[in-house]
Curated annotation (Swiss-Prot):
This is Protein BCCIP homolog. Residues 34-65 have a biased composition (Acidic residues). Belongs to the BCP1 family. It comes from the Eukaryota. Residues 1-65 are annotated as: Disordered. GO terms for cellular component: nucleus. Residues 11-33 have a biased composition (Basic and acidic residues). Residues 1-10 have a biased composition (Basic residues). Pfam families: BCCIP.
Length: 349
């Protein structure tokens, strides 16, 4: 079985000696191989039943032969992980003015809180062999309002600009309230993994974060979480939205006048609410199925921030075009804890 270790302190190389609790997982990746050349068999050549059975057995076992096991380690962020953490943060914050290096240093400073997921290594491998496969932690947003780090100010500028363009007024005002509160009871939840990384790691990682938070002296009351998702592009959606928001009666040529900003936002939100959605992190869907606590959110497009050809740009699947979006969620502590608990209990995805 592959293993995930949660190290509570010290260097990564000392995990075994520290005898910390083990978090158990298994990751299986399929390795595609070039097909073996098939020899032509003459039509008059006899092939025994036993030979046929051997061939069938080989085909049935092909998948097992191509399965590779990888061990992963999960441990608190350290200086060695700075570049990997930046890469993880870049998945959410595309082409922003946020100082992600400074944010990564802030995350490292909060260790042992948080989890960085990387492939296990042996003694012959070097630090250069490392890359981060996942990151899960919380970043306090307002525990030092009068002298907040620049990356925190940049973060609020970013989310406020996005909210101003596409969010209801209540969400914009809520973000402003969080920014000025200065009580240290609000945080950003970071939950990043490489695209299509197995969700089998979720229970162990969420359980670790939930355990960490239970020991915090100051409890978070409000959490901001920026999710990655894709939304199907619907032909003629703009026309439908315009007609619906204008209360069209179907009378040709009748004009209702220009839509105001608030109407446009409501119309856009209604269109997105009815569209097909896929979350990059499948567990994120559970957040909106939970009944405990409260949450508000809005979606905003990011395809203009992604290089064409990137795996994070628009994709085609089953004849549909899926455009990249971000969903900014603001939730209370009850919803957040229920989300972590659901994940740590082993949600079915």
């Amino acid at each position: 079985m592959g293993r995930v270790f949660k190290k509570k302190g010290g260097a990564k190389r000392e995990a075994e000696e520290e005898k910390q609790e083990e978090l158990v997982m298994r990751k299986k990746l399929r390795k595609e191989e070039e097909p073996e050349p098939v020899e032509d068999v003459e039509e008059d050549e006899d092939v025994s039943d036993e030979d046929d059975e051997d061939i069938d057995d080989e085909e049935e076992d092909e998948d097992e032969q191509n399965i590779m096991d990888f061990d992963f380690e999960a441990y608190p962020p350290s200086e060695d992980d700075r570049d990997g953490i930046v890469n993880m943060l870049t998945q959410t914050f595309l082409r922003t003015d946020i100082d992600l290096k400074a944010m990564s240093e802030g995350i490292i400073a909060k260790a042992p809180h948080g989890v960085v997921l990387t492939q296990a290594y042996d003694d012959e491998e070097t630090e250069e062999d490392y890359m981060a496969y996942g990151l899960c932690t919380t970043v306090p947003l307002n525990d030092n309002k009068d002298d907040a780090p620049k990356f925190i100010k940049d973060l609020f500028t970013y989310v406020l600009n996005r909210a101003k363009k596409g969010a209801p007024t209540e969400i914009y005002k809520k973000i402003e309230e969080i920014q000025v509160s200065g009580d240290g009871k609000s945080a950003l939840f970071v939950n990043e993994r490489l695209l299509n990384f197995p969700t089998i790691v979720v229970p162990q990682i969420f359980g670790s974060i939930r355990e960490d938070l239970s020991g915090f002296e100051t409890k978070y009351k409000t959490i901001i979480y920026i999710q990655k998702l894709r939304i199907v592009e619907t032909d003629g959606s703009e026309a439908k939205v315009g007609a619906s928001s204008n209360g069209s009666s179907g009378v040709a040529g009748k004009k209702k006048g220009k839509m105001g900003k608030a109407e446009k936002k409501r119309a856009a939100a209604a269109a997105l609410a009815n569209a097909e959605i896929e979350f990059d992190n499948p567990e994120d869907r559970v957040l909106f199925e939970i009944k405990e606590g409260k949450e508000i959110h809005f979606d905003y497009p990011v395809h203009m921030d992604v290089e064409p050809g990137s795996k994070f740009h628009s994709t085609e699947k089953d004849g549909k075009k899926w455009n990249p979006f971000r969903r900014l969620v603001i939730m209370d502590d009850k919803r957040f804890d229920a989300f972590l608990k659901k994940g740590s209990d082993g949600i079915i995805i």
